[in-house]
Each structure stands twice: as C-alpha cells, then as structure tokens.
C-alpha cells in the first residue's frame, strides 16, 4: 500500500500558518487565553512538544528499523528539556515550590483507600520526597562540588 503523501503539503501549510501567526502577534496577544487553562503561547509550546515527540519517534524508528515509541522518562524528560530551559530561573523555582506545596496538601488529605491503590501502582507518586531529594542533592552537589567530595 502506498502512503498518501498529501501530509507533505498539509504539514507545510500548517507550519506556514504557525509562522505567520507567531510573526503577527504581540507578547500580550501571546498571553491571550485559549480555553480555561491555555494561552496562545501554550498552544505553541504544546505543538513544539508533540512535534519533538514525533521527531524522536522518527529518529528512533530509523535507527532501530522498527517503530519505537518513547518510554515515559524519555518522553517527559528528554523531550521537555528545551521547554524547561526556556523558563526563567526564578519562575522555575516558584513553579516547583508551589506545585510541591499543592501536592503535599493533596496527598495529606487524600482518601486512604485510593492512596493505597496509587501507592501499590507506583510508590513514588506518594513518596515525592524520593524524587525531590534525588534532584535537590544533584543540584546542591553541582553548586558546591568540593563540599560533596
């Protein structure tokens, strides 16, 4: 079966539309709401993220000779890296702290029977300290390598 190659022109047209929209919008317009939680800028970030996922699948499939879908850690960590890098440092810290506080409150008040189900599936959803501590240790070691040697 021959693949319908109309995707080439459709993709190019959508990319041209994206480029034109981005070129004409002000920063204020980029912050304009799109639905309840998104903005125009988030739409662009979402498109970039999922296009990076498609690029990963194409590269890995070509390398392996079979379709390769990224596992969760690659999908989230490797593909998200350029987006995280674009967040101003203080905003990244603020987001991490606010999210940790909200999650801590939610976990503390969560229905025990459901919490046990979640813990049985993946305990690190409940014991967030494991993941937080791992990365905080890495950050502190990078900032002060002599003290950790």
Show the residue positions of the predicted features.
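Alpha-helical bundle segments that constitute or directly flank the non-heme di-iron/ferroxidase center
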Residues: 1-27, 49-59
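Solvent-exposed interaction patches of small proteins and small membrane subunits
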Residues: 2-9, 32, 63-69, 94
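Hydrophobic packing residues in well-ordered alpha-helices of helical domains and bundles
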Residues: 4-11, 89-96, 125-128, 132
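Positions in alpha-helical segments
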Residues: 5, 38, 42, 82, ...
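Structural signal for well-ordered, non-membrane alpha-helices
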Residues: 15-23, 51-55, 97-111, 136
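Short, contiguous alpha-helical
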Residues: 29-75, 112-149
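Acidic/histidine-rich alpha-helical segments that form the ligand environment
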Residues: 76-116
């Amino acid at each position: 079966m021959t693949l319908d190659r109309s995707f080439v022109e459709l993709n190019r047209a959508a990319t041209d539309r994206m480029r034109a929209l981005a070129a004409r919008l002000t920063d204020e317009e980029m912050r304009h709401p799109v639905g309840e939680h998104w903005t125009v800028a988030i739409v662009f970030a979402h498109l970039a993220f999922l296009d990076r996922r498609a690029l990963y699948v194409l590269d890995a499939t070509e390398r392996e000779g079979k379709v390769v879908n990224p596992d969760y850690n690659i999908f989230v960590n490797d593909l998200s890296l350029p987006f995280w890098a674009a967040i101003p440092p203080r905003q990244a810290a603020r987001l991490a702290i606010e999210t940790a506080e909200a999650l801590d409150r939610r976990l503390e008040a969560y229905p025990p029977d459901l919490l046990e189900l979640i813990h049985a599936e993946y305990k690190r959803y409940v014991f967030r300290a494991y993941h937080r501590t791992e990365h905080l240790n890495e950050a502190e070691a990078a900032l002060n390598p002599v003290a950790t040697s």
